[in-house]
Structures are given as structure tokens and as C-alpha cells.
């Protein structure tokens, strides 16, 4: 058994990002007050996210044999039946760990598992529906951290909404990048439906709204670290807005959006400190 192969399979860097997102939601909701169980929502989110990545690779194996033959499943480093069982274990452990957090967090964990499974099994091919599910489950990582602290609503809703729309725009950009492969595989993305230029316009409108509204959290309780950080990060989005509406630009934009996503988690987290 290769540990490296399993870390690749769960996309460990993405899982860490999900955990950081949950941590952000938690510290915003509690104003950095920790209970002995503060780590549980981080574990729940990490395990369920990992399970989602694994089951996604299970259903994507035929496509990955062509597009990503080096991945653990198509390369044969991990057997498909083993990966399927591994995803079940990850989902089950994540769900069990959510029980001490209460009925509502348990329910959210269960719903997220169902969404991730159905996305991998069939909803991904619906394109726009799949984009919304990816955006929703990404945003739920932040929301879950706040929810697990005992709050249904609070300032943690702000980054949750922000993450949803940012991820949605990133999914549209990814659809532009993957348009040829999606056409061949019958994935009905927005880019396949409308074409790359129209999809670029929609993605840029969303990013433009995010830039315009990005200072608002400062006036809703986040500190000056947030304001300075988000305005600096907005430069990346402005650069994306001036890129040409092409497939090549989508590849460049996606790389910049990864940097922006990490930076946003940091500035929202530090921006919740009471200074």
C-alpha cells in the first residue's frame, strides 16, 4: 500500500483547504473562543471532502484513463473496488464523528455526503447543476464550522456566500478550460451550451460583483486586516477581468483563482480577530 497514492487520491491539499475553511467559519462564529470539541467540525469536513474526492475518481476512471492516466486509479496503484470501499469508510467515519455536534450538524453532514455521491455518479454530467453543487459543498465547509459552534446564523454567513459565488465563477472558468473534453464526454456545461465567450462574460460579471462588494464585510464587523488583505487580493480578480475571453486565458485565470481562494480564507480568518 502506497501512502502517497492515497494522499493523491483524496487530494490532500484540497482537503486541508476544506479544513481551513471550516476553521474559519468556527473562529468567526465564536470570536476565537475554543471548546474542547472545536476540532470535530474540521475532522468531519475533512473526511467527507476526502470521501467526495475518492468517489469522484471512482466514477471518473474511464475519463481519467485518457485525460489523467497518472492518477492513482487509472494507473493501477489503487484498485477501483478498494477506492470505493475507502470512500464509504471516509463518509461513514465523518458522519459518525458529526453525531456529538448535534442533530442539525449531523443532518448537514448527511446531506453533503448525498450531494457529493450523486454529483460523482450522475449530476456532474448535467453541467450547470454540477457547478452549483460544487459551489454549494465548498461553501458549506465554511458554514459547517460556524454551525458546529451552535449558531445557525452569524457573521460566518458572509464568507460562506462569498465562497459560493467565487467557486461558481471558478467552475464556469474551468468549464471554458475543459470545453472540448466536455463536448466529447457529453457533459452539458455552461461553456458547452453558450460558448466560451458568453461563459467568460457571466464569470466576469460574478467576479466584478465580488470585487465591488468585497469591502462590505469591513463595515459588518471584520477588522482592518480583512480590508487591506481583500483589497490587495482584488488586484488578482481585476487582472482576470481584463484577460481575453479565450480558452488559454481560462487556464491562466484558474491558477490565479487558486491563489485568490487561499488568500481569501486567510484574510477572512485574520479579519475576524478583535483588534
Curated annotation (Swiss-Prot):
CDD domains referenced in this protein's UniProt entry, alphabetically: PT_UbiA_DGGGPS
Ranges annotated as spanning the membrane: 12-32, 35-55, 88-108, 125-145, 146-166, 200-220, 224-244, 255-275
GO MF, one example: magnesium ion binding
GO cellular component: plasma membrane
Annotated keywords: Cell membrane, Lipid biosynthesis, Lipid metabolism, Magnesium, Membrane, Phospholipid biosynthesis, Phospholipid metabolism, Transferase, Transmembrane, Transmembrane helix
Reactions this protein catalyses: sn-3-O-(geranylgeranyl)glycerol 1-phosphate + (2E,6E,10E)-geranylgeranyl diphosphate = 2,3-bis-O-(geranylgeranyl)-sn-glycerol 1-phosphate + diphosphate
Topology in the lipid bilayer: Multi-pass membrane protein
BP GO terms, sorted: glycerophospholipid biosynthetic process
Main subcellular location: membrane
Matches recorded under Pfam families: UbiA (PF01040)
EC number: 2.5.1.42
Record flagged with keyword Nucleus: no
Location of the protein in the cell: Cell membrane
Cofactor(s) annotated in UniProt: Mg(2+)
General function of this protein: Prenyltransferase that catalyzes the transfer of the geranylgeranyl moiety of geranylgeranyl diphosphate (GGPP) to the C2 hydroxyl of (S)-3-O-geranylgeranylglyceryl phosphate (GGGP). This reaction is the second ether-bond-formation step in the biosynthesis of archaeal membrane lipids.
Matching HAMAP family: DGGGP_synth
Family: Belongs to the UbiA prenyltransferase family. DGGGP synthase subfamily.
PANTHER family: CHLOROPHYLL SYNTHASE, CHLOROPHYLL SYNTHASE, CHLOROPLASTIC
Name listed for the protein in its UniProt record: Digeranylgeranylglyceryl phosphate synthase
Amino acid at each position: 500500500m502506497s501512502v502517497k497514492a492515497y494522499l493523491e487520491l483524496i487530494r490532500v491539499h484540497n482537503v486541508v483547504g476544506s479544513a481551513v475553511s471550516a476553521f474559519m467559519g468556527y473562529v468567526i462564529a465564536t470570536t476565537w473562543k475554543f471548546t474542547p470539541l472545536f476540532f470535530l467540525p474540521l475532522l468531519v469536513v475533512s473526511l467527507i471532502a476526502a470521501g467526495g474526492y475518492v468517489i469522484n475518481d471512482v466514477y471518473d476512471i474511464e475519463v481519467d484513463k485518457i485525460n489523467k492516466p497518472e492518477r492513482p486509479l487509472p494507473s493501477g496503484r489503487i484498485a477501483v473496488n478498494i477506492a470505493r470501499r475507502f470512500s464509504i469508510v471516509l463518509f461513514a467515519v465523518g458522519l459518525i464523528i458529526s453525531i456529538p455536534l448535534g442533530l442539525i450538524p449531523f443532518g448537514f453532514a448527511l446531506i453533503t455526503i448525498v450531494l457529493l455521491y450523486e454529483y460523482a455518479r450522475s449530476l456532474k454530467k448535467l453541467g450547470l447543476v454540477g457547478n452549483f453543487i460544487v459551489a454549494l459543498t465548498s461553501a458549506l465547509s465554511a458554514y459547517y464550522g460556524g454551525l458546529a459552534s451552535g449558531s445557525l446564523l452569524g457573521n460566518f454567513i458572509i464568507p460562506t456566500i462569498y465562497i459560493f459565488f467565487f467557486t461558481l465563477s471558478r467552475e464556469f472558468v474551468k468549464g471554458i478550460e475543459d470545453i472540448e473534453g466536455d463536448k466529447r464526454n457529453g457533459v452539458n456545461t455552461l461553456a458547452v451550451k453558450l460558448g466560451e465567450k458568453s461563459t467568460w462574460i457571466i464569470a466576469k460579471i460574478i467576479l466584478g460583483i465580488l470585487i465591488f462588494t468585497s469591502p462590505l464585510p469591513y463595515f459588518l464587523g471584520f477588522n482592518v486586516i480583512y480590508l487591506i488583505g481583500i483589497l490587495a487580493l482584488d488586484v488578482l480578480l481585476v487582472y482576470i477581468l481584463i484577460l481575453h475571453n479565450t480558452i488559454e486565458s481560462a487556464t491562466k485565470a484558474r491558477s490565479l483563482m487558486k491563489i485568490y481562494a487561499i488568500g481569501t480564507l486567510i484574510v477572512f480568518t485574520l479579519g475576524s480577530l478583535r483588534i
